[in-house]
Regions:
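Conserved Radical SAM active-site core
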Residues: 1-119, 129-158
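Auxiliary Fe-S-binding modules of radical SAM enzymes
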Residues: 12, 116-119, 124, 129-351
Length: 351
C-alpha cells in the first residue's frame, strides 16, 4: 500500500521502477527486503551458512495485515522466515514503515512485542512517504505531529523494556519522527553505535556531533566564500542552527540555508534525498546565493553526479551561475565545506 516505487511518476529512467527483493543484495549491499520471494531452500541456506546481517522490511507481525500491506499472498511465509532466522541466531535489522490507520497504535505495540520475544536484532521506525502519484492505490494519510509523538512514545516504552531485559533498546525512531513531533533528538548513546544510520536513524545527531568537533579543527581560510545550502524542508531548520553556530564562532563566515519544496513528488515529501535538480534550479535561480551552492551527497545517484530526474550537477551549476559543491555525509565534511573556496568542488566524502 505504500511502496515508493508504485508512487513514482511515469517517464523516469527504468532503473527507478525496479523492485529489488534479493536476499543476497540484502547481505551484500544492505537492501531492505520483504522475504516474500524467498524459497524454503534459500531460507535454509541462509541458516546453514549463517549469512548475516539480513535487512528485512517487517511493517507488522499481524498475519492478515502483513499480507494486506505487502499486497502479496506469500507475505505469511515471510513472517515464518523471520521467526526461523531469529531462532537460528541470524542477525536481522528491520524497518517498520508506519502508516497511520494501518500499522500504528495497538498494531505497532503488537509488532514491537512480537519482535522483542523473537529477539529481533534491531528495528527502525520510519514515517510513510506519500507522493502525489497515488492513483489506484490505497488511501494513506501522512504522519502528523501527534502521530509522530505517539510512535516515539511507543518505541521508547518497548525500548526501555528491552534495555532493561536484554541490554539493547532494539527499537529506534528515524530522525524525521522527532522533527515532525517537535521533539529534541536523543543523545548519541541512545543509538547504540548507529546501527540504523542508513535508515535515517541518528543521522542528524551524528552529523551535529561531528560538525561541532570539525568546527574546532577546521582550516580557516584567509577569505571566506559566501554560500547557500540547499536541502529539504524537513532538515532545513536543523541545518540553519548548525550554520548559525558556525557563523557565531567565525564572524567573517556568511551563509544561508534554503528549504527546497518538493514540487516533483509533492510537498508531503520533505527529505533532501528525494529532491530533484529541476526543483532546486527553479527555486534557487532567482535568489541571491553567494559564491557557491552546497548540496548533500545523498541527493545524487550512488557513485554519480546525477539527480533522480537525470539533472546533472554540472547542469544545475550552469543554471545557477555558480559552482555546486557536493558535500559528504558526515559533519566533518559539512564543516570543511563551509570554509572551502568557491572554485573547489567537494568530493564524495573524506578520504
Amino acid at each position: 500500500i505504500f511502496c515508493f516505487v508504485d508512487q513514482m511518476p511515469p517517464g523516469m529512467r527504468q532503473t527507478l521502477y525496479f523492485k529489488d527483493d534479493d536476499a543476497r543484495l540484502s547481505f551484500l549491499q544492505g537492501n531492505y527486503i520483504t522475504l516474500t520471494n524467498l524459497t524454503e531452500r534459500e531460507a535454509q541456506r541462509i541458516i546453514d551458512l549463517r549469512i548475516s546481517p539480513i535487512n528485512v522490511s517487517v511493517h507488522t507481525t499481524d498475519p492478515q495485515l502483513h499480507c494486506t500491506m505487502l499486497g502479496n499472498k506469500n507475505a505469511l511465509r515471510s513472517l515464518d522466515y523471520i521467526r526461523a532466522f531469529c531462532k537460528a541466531g541470524i542477525v536481522m535489522n528491520g524497518q517498520i514503515v508506519v502508516c497511520p490507520g494501518w500499522n500504528d497504535g495497538d498494531q505497532l505495540r503488537r509488532t514491537l512485542r512480537d519482535l522483542t520475544e523473537m529477539q529481533f536484532s534491531s528495528c527502525s521506525l520510519v514515517p510513510v512517504g506519500i507522493t502525489k502519484y497515488r492513483q489506484g492505490l490505497a488511501k494513506l494519510r501522512p504522519v502528523d505531529a501527534a502521530t509522530a509523538a505517539e510512535i516515539i512514545d511507543i518505541a521508547d516504552e518497548y525500548g526501555r523494556e528491552n534495555l532493561r531485559r536484554f541490554g539493547t533498546r532494539r527499537f529506534f525512531c528515524a530522525d524525521e519522527l522527532y522533527l515532525r513531533a517537535g521533539r529534541p533528538l536523543p543523545q548519541a548513546e541512545y543509538y547504540e553505535g548507529y546501527r540504523q544510520l542508513e535508515n535515517g536513524v541518528g543521522l542528524m545527531r551524528s552529523l551535529e556531533d561531528d560538525f561541532l568537533a570539525g568546527l574546532a579543527t577546521v582550516d580557516v581560510p584567509a577569505h571566506f566564500s559566501p554560500f547557500t545550502i540547499a536541502t529539504g524542508t524537513a532538515a532545513a531548520p536543523f541545518l540553519r542552527g548548525l550554520v548559525q553556530r558556525a557563523m557565531g564562532d567565525y564572524p567573517g563566515l556568511r551563509g544561508q540555508v534554503i528549504a527546497v519544496e518538493n514540487d516533483f513528488f509533492g510537498h508531503t515529501i520533505d527529505v533532501a534525498g528525494l529532491l530533484t535538480g529541476q526543483d532546486i534550479s527553479a527555486q534557487l535561480k532567482k535568489r541571491p546565493l553567494g559564491d557557491r551552492v552546497l548540496i548533500p551527497l545523498h541527493m545524487l545517484r550512488h557513485g554519480e553526479t546525477v539527480f533522480l530526474d537525470d539533472y546533472t550537477v554540472e547542469r544545475l551549476s550552469q543554471e545557477l551561475g555558480r559552482p555546486v559543491q557536493v558535500v559528504g555525509l558526515d559533519g566533518f565534511d559539512l564543516a570543511d565545506a563551509l570554509f572551502a573556496p568557491a572554485e573547489s568542488r567537494q568530493d564524495n566524502g573524506r578520504s
